[in-house]
UniProtKB/Swiss-Prot annotation:
The record marks 79, 98, 107 as: Not hydroxylated. GO terms for molecular function: hormone activity; identical protein binding; protein homodimerization activity; protein serine/threonine kinase activator activity; sialic acid binding; signaling receptor binding. HMW-complex blood contents are higher in females than in males, are increased in males by castration and decreased again upon subsequent testosterone treatment, which blocks HMW-complex secretion. The record marks 233 as: Not glycosylated. HMW complexes are more extensively glycosylated than smaller oligomers. Hydroxylation and glycosylation of the lysine residues within the collagen-like domain of adiponectin seem to be critically involved in regulating the formation and/or secretion of HMW complexes and consequently contribute to the insulin-sensitizing activity of adiponectin in hepatocytes. Induction: During hormone-induced adipose differentiation and activated by insulin. Residues 1-17 form the signal peptide. Glycans are attached at residues 23-24, 68, 71, 80, 104. Its main location: secreted. Important adipokine involved in the control of fat metabolism and insulin sensitivity, with direct anti-diabetic, anti-atherogenic and anti-inflammatory activities. Stimulates AMPK phosphorylation and activation in the liver and the skeletal muscle, enhancing glucose utilization and fatty-acid combustion. Antagonizes TNF-alpha by negatively regulating its expression in various tissues such as liver and macrophages, and also by counteracting its effects. Inhibits endothelial NF-kappa-B signaling through a cAMP-dependent pathway. The modification 5-hydroxylysine is found at residues 36, 68, 71, 80, 104. This is Adiponectin. It comes from the Eukaryota. It comes from Mus musculus.
Length: 247
């Protein structure tokens, strides 16, 4: 082995003779010193090929946050979106403050008041049974809806009417009935007490149509005709409209 190494050394020297002269001391470091021990005959091999790239290493740790940048410019206005669905009705809000009073309105038309009334009395005690009693003593008959010549009230305004009568009874019993359109609707009977003046009365509500007639008359024979009146005792018949029909 030593012989082979010396031979290689001699072969190397001529290749460098034409160049600069190199001493043995300068070349000595380039030679690998022979190993010692059991492998004293080892010789350096030819350098191998470069190895493959290793696997990528792990990602490094996150760096510290940078400083906040400056605010950017506002972007352009985007297109108008589609109309959304109608939302649910919200809760009722609190009651507002009262508003200021409005202006006074123009005067309205006066409502028309329907009037129909009469109040009459008996001037004589002479009456005929079974015919209308003619009350000729007029207390009130401004609308002239009562006719003293016939003793009848004639309806000119349809509606609800109130009728009443107060009869003085003397010398005989009395039977009086109130008629509407030839039909008795109310009856009053009073039995005379000797040496006394009695009173008989009655009242009723009736609905009348235009043209209806209402009156009083004594019914029965002459024995039941104690109807009486003088200058201190009256027998009266009264009626008036309460409500007129609106349709």
């Amino acid at each position: 082995m030593l012989l082979l190494q010396a031979l290689l050394f001699l072969l190397i020297l001529p290749s460098h003779a034409e160049d600069d002269v190199t001493t043995t001391e300068e070349l000595a470091p380039a030679l690998v010193p022979p190993p010692k021990g059991t492998c004293a005959g080892w010789m350096a091999g030819i350098p191998g090929h470069p190895g493959h790239n290793g696997t990528p290493g792990r990602d490094g740790r996150d760096g510290t946050p940078g400083e906040k940048g400056e605010k950017g410019d506002a972007g352009l206005l985007g297109p108008k979106g589609e109309t959304g669905d109608v939302g649910m009705t919200g809760a009722e809000g609190p009651r507002g403050f009262p508003g200021t009073p409005g202006r006074k309105g123009e005067p309205g038309e006066a409502a028309y008041v329907y009037r129909s009334a009469f109040s009459v009395g008996l001037e004589t005690r002479v009456t005929v049974p079974n015919v209308p009693i003619r009350f000729t003593k007029i207390f009130y008959n401004q609308q002239n809806h009562y006719d003293g010549s016939t003793g009848k009230f004639y309806c000119n305004i349809p509606g609800l009417y109130y009728f009443s009568y107060h009869i003085t009874v003397y010398m005989k019993d009395v039977k009086v009935s109130l008629f509407k359109k030839d039909k008795a609707v109310l009856f009053t009977y009073d039995q005379y007490q000797e040496k006394n003046v009695d009173q008989a009365s009655g009242s009723v509500l009736l609905h009348l149509e235009v043209g209806d007639q209402v009156w009083l008359q004594v019914y029965g024979d002459g024995d039941h005709n104690g109807l009486y009146a003088d200058n201190v005792n009256d027998s009266t018949f009264t009626g008036f409209l309460l409500y007129h029909d609106t349709n």
